[in-house]
């Protein structure tokens, strides 16, 4: 990948992360800070960053639900 493509991909991912965090906060009535902690400590985050199974293509709501489910198990 070229640098310009990398920067664009990371900007898109960062926006997606913000939406997922917001979804977690709204769906499960936790503060944004708690939602951020849950998100950034999720085992799913490295998979999203690496593009495993095109997880970044899944809906924000789906990913929020999966991250929450992992956290409560």
Question: Each predicted region: which residue ranges?
Answer:
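C-terminal alpha-helical interaction appendages
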Residues: 1-73
